Amino acid sequence: MRLPAQLLGLLMLWVPGSSGDVVMTQSPLSLPVTLGQPASISCRSSQSLVYSDGNTYLNWFQQRPGQSPRRLIYKVSNWDSGVPDRFSGSGSGTDFTLKISRVEAEDVGVYYCMQGTHWP
């Protein structure tokens, strides 16, 4: 069964800082999916997100229709409490991916990547 819904959105962040603006770009803009099949969303940063402490502060958020956003993944690949293990995050430096191993109907929504490394 195909879900004719938008599974993700594009988020571009300009964060003023000493090393210049950080631009986050997601692709694709829209992703038709099939229940039970995998789905993948990419996120690219214009600068490395590796912080001076060695951590990479890349988060993934999900916003279901009519609901507030909730964080799914923090520091690239760590699950927040209650997040199903069909979600996984990976990547390093500037390139990151959110994968859903088996899409369920409740997964329909908008997905955002957000960096937390570079701040004004």
Swiss-Prot record:
Region annotation (Framework-2) ranges: 60-74
PROSITE patterns referenced in this protein's UniProt entry, alphabetically: IG_LIKE
UniProt-annotated stretches for the region Complementarity-determining-1: 44-59
Region (Complementarity-determining-2): 75-81
Species, as recorded: Homo sapiens
Matching SUPFAM superfamilies: Immunoglobulin
Subunit structure: Immunoglobulins are composed of two identical heavy chains and two identical light chains; disulfide-linked.
GO cellular component terms listed in the entry, alphabetical order: extracellular region; immunoglobulin complex; plasma membrane
Region called Framework-1, residue ranges: 21-43
Chief location: secreted
UniProt signal peptide: 1-20
One of the GO biological process terms: adaptive immune response
Chain positions covered by the region annotation Framework-3: 82-113
Keywords: Adaptive immunity, Cell membrane, Disulfide bond, Immunity, Immunoglobulin, Immunoglobulin domain, Membrane, Secreted, Signal
Function summary: V region of the variable domain of immunoglobulin light chains that participates in the antigen recognition. Immunoglobulins, also known as antibodies, are membrane-bound or secreted glycoproteins produced by B lymphocytes. In the recognition phase of humoral immunity, the membrane-bound immunoglobulins serve as receptors which, upon binding of a specific antigen, trigger the clonal expansion and differentiation of B lymphocytes into immunoglobulins-secreting plasma cells.
InterPro entries (UniProt xref): Ig-like_dom (IPR007110), Ig-like_dom_sf (IPR036179), Ig-like_fold (IPR013783), Ig_V-set (IPR013106), IgV_Light_Chain (IPR050150)
Pfam families: V-set (PF07686)
Domain Ig-like: from-to ranges: 21-120
Disulfide partners: C43-C113
Annotated region (Complementarity-determining-3), positions in chain: 114-120
The protein, known as: Immunoglobulin kappa variable 2D-30
Cellular localization per UniProt: Secreted; Cell membrane
